[in-house]
Amino acid sequence: MIAFTDIVGMDLAKQALMLLAVDPSLGGVVIPSTVGSGKSTLARAFADILPEGTPFVELPLNVTEDRLIGGVDLEATLASGQRVVQHGVLSKAHKGVLYVDSLSLLDSSAVSHIMDAMSRGAVIVEREGLSEVHPADFMLVGTYDPSDGEVRMGLLDRIGIIVPFTPVNDYRARKQIVSLVMGTRNEEDTQDELRMLRGIIGAAREQLHHVSITNEQIKGLIQTAISLGVEGNRVDIFAIRAALANAALGQRTEVDDEDLKLAVKLVLVPRATRMPEREPSEEEMQQEEPPPPEEQPEQEGEDENAPPDETDSDADEEQEETPDMIEELMMDAIETDLPENILNISLASKKKAKSGSRGEALNNKRGRFVRSQPGEIKSGKVALIPTLISAAPWQAARKAEKAKKGIKTGALVISTDDVKIKRFRDKSGTLFIFMVDASGSMALNRMRQAKGAVASLLQNAYVHRDQVSLISFRGKQAQVLLPPSQSVDRAKRELDVLPTGGGTPLASALLTGWETAKQARTKGITQIMFVMITDGRGNIPLAAAVDPAAAKAPKEELEKEVEALALSIQSDGIASIVVDTQMNYLSRGEAPKLAQKLGGRYFYLPNAKAEQIVEAALS
C-alpha cells in the first residue's frame, strides 16, 4: 500500500487532510475527482498520519441499517441465551475516521444516519426492544466521481473542506508515480518520513490552542463568503477553523494572509454560487477618471468637515446593466405564484401512490425497522425478539416430543412457523422529472414564467431531499440535461442557460421521461412524478430524430404517438402534472388534453393563483 508521504502531487488535498488531522472539528474532507486520479489512494493513506490507535473505518456502499447503526447480534444472542448488542460502523469510527468511497452513490437512508450522527456525536439505536446511545464522534473523509452524481447538500454542510482536483498530467510527476509503483521504495525511509509528519501534526494540535485570529480577519472571511454567495454561519466557522489549523501547522501564534487564502480556497470557493467582480486596475481607474469638477461657491452653513455625499456613488453601484438580446432569450428564472406544496398535493391525490410518508415504502431488506410478519428465513432478515416470543409458549411441548424420539435439543426449539421477518420502511425517495418545453412557441409565450415555476418546484424538492431530473425538448428530440440527482443547484444552473427555438417534440419528451423513470426504478426509486411545462402543441414525431424527412407528419399521427405514450405512462403508475404556459387566446386546449391522457393534474400558469391551484389539486 502506498504511504501518505509517497503520494505524488495532490498537494492541496494532502494539505486539507493535514488540517483535518490537526483540527477534527472541521468535520471532514470531501475529494471529488475523476476515475483514476488517485483520490481513493490518498484518502486511505490518511490513516498513516493520524495518531497511533486512531480508528479508520471504511463504509461499504451496500451497508445495511443494522450494520450501520448497530442492533442485536443474532448469532451471539442465540449462543449465549442473552441479548448481545452489536455496535454499528458509525460507533466503531468514534474518535477516528469514517471513510466512504463513491460518496455520491451512498444510499439516502445511510446518508441521513451519517448526518444525524455528525450532528449529535452519537448514534441512537432503537430497534427490537433495544434502546441505546452509542458515541459516534468521527471525521468523515469522502471521495467520489462527479459524473456519478452529486453529494447530498445536507451532508456537505457538515463537512468543512471540499477539494476538487484534476489528475496529475505533468510528465515528470507521472513518471515519478510510475517509478514509485513499479519500483522499490525504502521502507525505513518511508516510516521515518511518516513519523516526522505525525510529529508535526501532534505539535500543531498542541499549538492550535495558542493561535489567535483578529476580528478584522474574521470580518474579511465573512465578507468573502457573502460576496461568493456562500450561505450559512457553519461555513464561516469552518473557514476560521481552517485558517487557525494552518497557522498551527506552521507553528505560528497568529493567523496571517496565507492562512486566510488557504481557508478561502478550501472552504469558501468550492461552495461559491457566484464570483465577485474583478476590481479595476490602477491604469483602468486612471483612464476612466473623470475630469475634476468645476469649483462652486460654498453654501452658507456648510460644514467643512462634513463627510462627502455618498448618494451618487451608491446609486452608481446599484445600477444594473441592461441585458442584451441573447440574454433576453436565455430568460432568467423569476418567482411565480405556484404554491410550494404543489408536489405534495399531487402525490397525495394520486390514487396509485402507496400510503405512508412521502417517498417511503415497506420492504424486507433495508430502511427503518417498523414491524415483523411471518415469513421464510430466505425472504428477509429474521426479527429475533418477535421470533423468540412466538416460539416461547411451545418450548416444553417441543422438547418433550424431541426427547421421546431421542433427539437432543438446545436451549431453544424453533420451528419455521415461529419465524418472523423484519419489515422496513425505506425512504427510497421521490424522483421529479421536469420536462421543459424549450421550443420556439414557448419563447413567444411564457418561458420566463415557466422557468420560474420549475425553480420554485425545484426548491420544494430540495427541502424534502428528493431527486430531480431535467429534460428539455426542442428541435427534433428531447435531451436529458440532468440525470436523476439530488443536486437542485445543478438543475437550476442548467435551467438558467436553457435556450429556446425550433419545433416541439412532445412525444420524444414523453418517451425520454418514461425511459428515465424506468431506469430510476431499477435503482429502488418507487415514487416518480412527471412535471411537464409546456403549451402542449407537439409538432415533431419520434421518427424525426433519425429521419429529418419524417418531421412533416400528419397531425393525426402525432396525436396517436402522444396518446399511446401517455396511456403507457399512466398505466405504469407515474403521477403527472401539466403546467400550461399558453396564452388563452392562442390555446386550443392542447395542454388540458395532454393532462387528461396522462391521468394527471392540470394547472394554467400565467394567471393562476396559489389558492386556485391548491383548490384544483384537492378537488
UniProtKB/Swiss-Prot annotation:
Its EC number is 6.6.1.1. Residues 273-321 are annotated as: Disordered. Pathway: Porphyrin-containing compound metabolism; bacteriochlorophyll biosynthesis. It is an enzyme of class 6 (ligase). Keywords: ATP-binding, Bacteriochlorophyll biosynthesis, Chlorophyll biosynthesis, Ligase, Nucleotide-binding, Photosynthesis. GO terms for biological process: bacteriochlorophyll biosynthetic process; photosynthesis. Coiled coil: none annotated. Residues 431-619 form the VWFA domain. InterPro entries: AAA+_ATPase, BchD/ChlD_VWA, ChlI/MoxR_AAA_lid, Mg_chelatase_ATPase-dsu, Mg_chelatse_chII-like_cat_dom, P-loop_NTPase, VWF_A, vWFA_dom_sf. The keyword Cytoplasm does not apply. It holds the Pfam family VWA_2. SUPFAM superfamilies: P-loop containing nucleoside triphosphate hydrolases (SSF52540), vWA-like (SSF53300). It comes from the Bacteria. GO terms for molecular function: ATP binding; ATP hydrolysis activity; magnesium chelatase activity. SMART domains: AAA (SM00382), VWA (SM00327). Residues 280-321 have a biased composition (Acidic residues). It catalyses: protoporphyrin IX + Mg(2+) + ATP + H2O = Mg-protoporphyrin IX + ADP + phosphate + 3 H(+). The keyword ATP-binding applies. ATP binds at S33, T34, V35, G36, S37, G38, K39, S40. Belongs to the Mg-chelatase subunits D/I family. Involved in bacteriochlorophyll biosynthesis; introduces a magnesium ion into protoporphyrin IX to yield Mg-protoporphyrin IX. PANTHER family: MAGNESIUM-CHELATASE SUBUNIT CHLD, CHLOROPLASTIC (PTHR43473:SF2). This is Magnesium-chelatase 67 kDa subunit. It comes from Chlorobaculum parvum (strain DSM 263 / NCIMB 8327) (Chlorobium vibrioforme subsp. thiosulfatophilum).
